[in-house]
Amino acid sequence: MSEGAYQRLWESSHATLQELLDQEQLLLEPAPDRERQSFQYRLASLYLHYLGLLRRFDTVYDQMVQPQKRRLLRRLLDGVAGRVLELKDELVRADLCENHCLDRVLQDFKLTPADLEVPIPKYFLLEQSTTVRERGLILAEILSRLEPVSSQKSFTGMHRTEAIILVQKAERARQGRLRATFMREIRRDEEQDGRIREDGWHKFSQGQAAVTIQKVWKGYLQRKRTQQDRRMEMEFIGMLPSPNQVEHLSIISQPCLVEDVQRLRQMEKEEEFRAAMVKAHDSLVETEGPDMKEKMKEQIRQWFIECHDLTGRFPDYPDASSGGSYSIFADKTPEQVRMELEMQMQENRKKEQEKSKEKGKDEKEKKKGKEEKAKKGEVDAVLQVLPSKCIPMICAGHEEYLNTWKNRCESIHPSQNYDSETLREEKRKEVELEIRIQVDELMRQELRKLRLAVDKEEERPLRAPKKTPGKKTGKKKEKDLTSDRSVESLYEELVISGLLRKSESVALKDYIGDFLYLGSTLSLVKKLPMPSLFDIRQNVALYAVLRLGSPDIHIMAPLIRSILLVGPSGMGKKMLVKAVCTETGANLFDLSPENLLGKYPGRNGAQMMVHIVFKVARLLQPSVIWIGNAEKNFYKKTPKEDKEMDPKRIKKDLTKALRLLTPGDRVMLIGTTSRPQLAEMRGLCRVYERILFMPRPDYASRYVLWKRMIEARGIQPTQHLDISALAKVSDGYTPGHILQAIQSVLSERRFLQLSKRPLVASEFLGQLVKLDPVYREEEESLKDWYFKTPLGKKSMKHRMDQLEAEEAKLDKEKKKRK
């Protein structure tokens, strides 16, 4: 895409953003519980449109070169990402489940499941690539020091006679195989000649022989042409992949090269802009600084005089924490300040009179409302969205675009150089704030002298606001048990003890799964739709990747400290943990019970271990703390075989450490378990704020799994391989089982035979039979457990209430008919 195309995409994105901001006002209106479906539909439509907007802003930010526009785009990108996470939280509260049936909404807006993909901003890794690389080198260096120097393997000697016998055996075997092949061919030729003699020779004339040869040859040519035409047609309509993979890869790689060139240009323009920022700041301080200082002093002196004339005393000077004099003179004249003071005094008097009247009225109205509701028996729940932290930021960015960039006459190829006038305006505000701090200090001293000279009054100390008794504000600060140690030493200690590991590089898109196409249909017939692998991937992207990727998004988004992945073995839980680390460049800490065996023994040791892990995780953000077999930390009754590792010893310290995480601490606890029934429900749900249930893959996901995993081995499926049949037969098997079957079948030897013997479905069935599937009893047990979680209970209660309401409605209709 050209620079003009990115400019047009930016403009169209702001037009869409304006429409969404208008819709936000309608969403603020509370809705009764009986209108839950329409409320969910409005939330889902907003969520979908914000996802599309996030995708477009990410594309423009990644390729826009102009540095000032990029800064605005970054704020908008973070704001929209935060709003997506807020809407996801609202959808969970409205739907009472983690997966949402959005197929009807997609159909109404003529969108595809690809539009539901959560885009991961590219700057997550690009802007911290240096940090991630340096951290990887440090980790590799520590690990190399731990590994013992591999000594040369000593091979057992072989006697010369034994070696000769071994070579002779191999050579004789080779000659025997060749002789057997040769004899097989001779025998086959003899049998063929014998059959011909028995049938007798058929004499052809020259013309008949020519016609026969032509007939066979023309038939062969026509079959070949028909097959080729059919393949071309199937490739054209997208039913078969293109055979020319080299051409396909070259087409894909060309835009990537252009994007890399654009990023190099971004770095050059950014360096120019930073140098210009320093130059503009210094220039403004020298040229306009003295005039600004004198103007501020005159304005503040005039305020002193006006207040003294109006109230008979000099005002209290605003504290620096409240903005100093800026809070009073923000684009105001002395006359406006005087009018405001008079209005404030009048309003204060009115408020005092109205408060006493309103108290009595409110109490009476509350009593009446309660009595009426009690009589009617109607206590209708209200659905309403929570106040957004991101909307003000988005509105400010959109307004800046309208005021600064919208009405500019840009050419087809807009200039990518910075705008000096806009830069000077921004720097002028910064210089003004710096000078105002200096002026405030001088004017506070001048105010003291005025009070002494005019009112003969000493300086009045500012009274601290009274604290309400019985209420504790803030949280207790964590006691630093390792204040005398550096981060580097703690980091090395964790690596040596095996608590900090190198994560494998796994992209989140490699977690393959398809969309649930019949979610709304299942809901209509009162069947509970289970999440697909697509839903699981999206939830992990929303709950973990987007939050950990950016500090600004983490601060604005609803705080989520921990998630628990629950599902049978082979569902890819560990793969998702690695994908989160890869997509965000996060450190991976392993606090699995098996990994803690023999490390940091005793009660104090466990406390120290959790403290060090969370301290390093906070200092080297982003970080992922993984606990495999998470149910063991909350065993109802510890089995005999696990008593030695004492898995419950970090339970208390883990809960305390999680509570200390605040917005801005990009640390995520991710637990994985396949047997949550063994754990105490209350403790597990207290630690893990979000629980993602991972059932067996459905037909659509299994079909995509078979196809993509075979293609990943470098093989294009042919018509001989019935993938649909494989997807049906493999019901009950996890992605791990499917991968094992593919790896077993596609050996090196089988790969070499593909040209002569194409793959067929029966080859994979033999391998699947050897594996144990996820039986229905196991999955039902996991479902029953999930519906005992807090969110699962709410969902089941809501469904029961709906069924009861429908039954009551049907009973009323039957009575009316009678």
Curated annotation (Swiss-Prot):
Full protein name: IQ and AAA domain-containing protein 1-like
Listed Basic and acidic residues bias regions: 798-818
UniProt cross-references to PROSITE patterns, sorted A to Z: IQ
Bias-annotated ranges (Basic residues): 463-476
The IQ domain, residue ranges: 206-235
Record region (Disordered): 344-377, 458-482, 795-818
Keywords (A to Z) from UniProt: ATP-binding, Nucleotide-binding
Organism placement in taxonomy: Eukaryota, Metazoa, Chordata, Craniata, Vertebrata
Binding site for ATP: G567, P568, S569, G570, M571, G572, K573, K574
Family: Belongs to the AAA ATPase family.
GO molecular function terms listed in the Swiss-Prot or TrEMBL record: ATP binding; ATP hydrolysis activity; microtubule severing ATPase activity
